[in-house]
From Swiss-Prot:
Annotated positions binding ATP: G150, G151, A152, G153, V154, G155, K156, T157
Catalytic activity: ATP + H2O + 4 H(+)(in) = ADP + phosphate + 5 H(+)(out)
Topology versus the membrane: Peripheral membrane protein
Name the UniProt record assigns to this protein: ATP synthase subunit beta
Stored Pfam families: ATP-synt_ab, ATP-synt_ab_N, ATP-synt_VA_C
Molecular function as annotated in GO: ATP binding; ATP hydrolysis activity; proton-transporting ATP synthase activity, rotational mechanism
Species per Swiss-Prot/TrEMBL record: Aliivibrio salmonicida (strain LFI1238) (Vibrio salmonicida (strain LFI1238))
Any single Gene Ontology cellular-component annotation: plasma membrane
Record note on quaternary structure: F-type ATPases have 2 components, CF(1) - the catalytic core - and CF(0) - the membrane proton channel. CF(1) has five subunits: alpha(3), beta(3), gamma(1), delta(1), epsilon(1). CF(0) has three main subunits: a(1), b(2) and c(9-12). The alpha and beta chains form an alternating ring which encloses part of the gamma chain. CF(1) is attached to CF(0) by a central stalk formed by the gamma and epsilon chains, while a peripheral stalk is formed by the delta and b chains.
Chief place of localization: membrane
Keywords, sorted A to Z: ATP synthesis, ATP-binding, Cell inner membrane, Cell membrane, CF(1), Hydrogen ion transport, Ion transport, Membrane, Nucleotide-binding, Translocase, Transport
Listed PANTHER family: ATP SYNTHASE, ATP SYNTHASE SUBUNIT BETA, MITOCHONDRIAL
Domain of life of the organism encoding this protein: Bacteria
Length: 467
């Protein structure tokens, strides 16, 4: 094991000099020998003259020039397998839940090749979420990649928590949650919610169904850049065992942002909007590994923060290309008090195809979208001239569209503590029956207020009796 000396420290970036004949490879992990706590560096560049430039996987406070650094000769490895279940780990796979060592028998490198083309398998099996607007407009595929796009405060994390509640709790497989650069409070809440739901069992961790990896907002950019790979590595191990895995990443934008910080510290020339020049490649390396093989599947749900609500920003735009379904959250819908604030006109799914979902589902979804689109076009006319100037046909479209908008709302289980309304899981069959009746005009005489925050169409009819 060769050793070197720290020669320069610039924030989260450290230069280390090694003997000419034993320079570490890119992505090799280096250990700082004299550090008070375990401190790992990851090699990013070979500058020349035996000097390598590395990013710190932790705080660089207290580092100084001349400290001895050991080359491990291998990339960062993290514990994998059933011992990780029910535990909270950091980017290096160390336990941070004060429940003792992980004690895993196997460790995998966080840098791994994506499965080859021959190994990959695709599936058209649908994954029911119990959320009406998602199951109708942008259905998820088992083994697919789903993105939740939204600006600040429109409900990405709440929607993700509801999906975890509805899918992970009904789902017999295992889940991995990677908290990438998000609030520590949310990670804490999630941990205790999972305990209450019985998904995390502290007394018998082996009975737990979720492994958690956190690299939160207050951590250095190196941690936030690599924590997604740590979570993914654990999910890959479960997949290779032949299991169906759910991988939740909150938030993929922070992964990009950490890459931007590291890129600037490494002295690379920024590209569009100040992002790193390697943005597409870094995103591709992560996303290509999130895939299903013949042995098992990884279904991933990724929250994507949209800066300034601009979907054309390079970070969300780069993410779009890799996804099978996109759930777009809209601030205008949220401002009207309609939750979940999912935009049925912007959200898409490759599964919304008559050959996959069936002709009836496809027709209902497209008719809902065309009704809402026509209402959107008529809004300007209504604002200027009022409803009276519309034709009878358009008045009917507006009336039905407003009912559809209200019927797309639904109370969430995870929001029960804030709203006081019990959450509702709506089956796809009930969802299709409700919207089919609305489009056919079966409920034209029911007041639109009855459709707010109800589950099935029968609930709306019950509400109408109380109005």
């Amino acid at each position: 094991m060769t050793t070197g000396k720290i020669v320069q420290i610039i924030g989260a970036v450290v230069d280390v000099e090694f003997p000419q004949g034993s320079v570490p490879r890119v992505y090799d992990a280096l250990n700082v020998v004299d550090a008070k706590e375990r401190l790992v560096l990851e090699v990013q560049q070979q500058i020349g003259g035996g000097v390598v430039r590395a990013i710190v996987m932790g705080s660089s406070d207290g580092l100084r020039r001349g400290l001895t650094v050991e080359n491990t000769g291998a990339p960062i490895t993290v514990p994998v397998g059933t011992k990780t279940l029910g535990r909270i780990m950091n980017v290096l796979g160390d336990a941070i839940d004060e429940c003792g060592e992980i004690g895993a028998e196997e460790h995998y490198s966080i840098h791994r090749a994506a499965p080859s083309y021959e190994e990959q398998a695709n599936s058209t099996e649908l994954l029911e979420t119990g959320v009406k607007v998602i199951d109708l407009i942008c259905p998820f595929a088992k083994g697919g990649k789903i993105g939740l796009f939204g600006g600040a405060g429109v409900g990405k994390t709440v929607n993700m928590m509801e999906l975890i509640n509805n899918i992970a709790l009904q789902h017999s497989g295992l889940s991995v949650f990677a908290g990438v650069g998000e609030r520590t409070r949310e990670g804490n809440d999630f941990y205790f919610e999972m305990q209450e739901a019985g998904v995390v069992n502290i007394e018998h961790p082996e009975e737990s169904k979720v492994a958690m990896v956190y690299g939160q907002m207050n951590e250095p950019p190196g941690n936030r850049l690599r924590v997604a790979l740590t979570g993914l590595t654990m999910a890959e191990r479960f997949r290779d065992e032949g299991r169906d895995v759910l991988l939740f990443i909150d938030n993929i934008y922070r992964y990009t942002l950490a890459g931007t910080e590291v890129s600037a510290l490494l002295g690379r020339m920024p590209s569009a909007v100040g992002y790193q020049p390697t943005l597409a490649e870094e995103m591709g390396v992560l996303q290509e590994r999130i895939t299903s093989t013949r042995s098992g599947s990884i279904t991933s749900v990724q929250a994507v923060y949209v800066p300034a609500d601009d979907l054309t920003d390079p970070s969300p735009a780069t993410t779009f290309a890799h996804l099978d379904a996109t759930v777009v959250l809209n601030r205008n819908i949220a401002s009207m008090g309609l939750y979940p604030a999912i935009d049925p006109l912007d959200s898409t799914s490759r599964q919304l195809d008559p050959l996959v979902v069936g002709q009836e589902h496809y027709d209902i979804a497209r008719n809902v979208q065309s009704t809402l689109q026509r209402y959107k076009e008529l809004k300007d006319i209504i604002a200027i001239l009022g409803m009276d100037e519309l034709s009878e046909e358009d008045k009917q479209v507006v009336s039905r569209a407003r009912k559809i908008e209200k019927f797309l709302t639904q109370p969430y289980h995870v929001a029960e503590v804030f709203t006081g309304d019990p959450g509702i899981y709506v089956s796809l069959k009930d969802t299709l029956a409700g919207f089919k009746g609305l489009l056919a005009g079966d409920y034209d005489d029911v007041p639109e207020q009855a459709f707010m925050y109800c589950g099935r169409i029968e609930d709306a009819l019950e509400n109408a009796k109380k109005l």
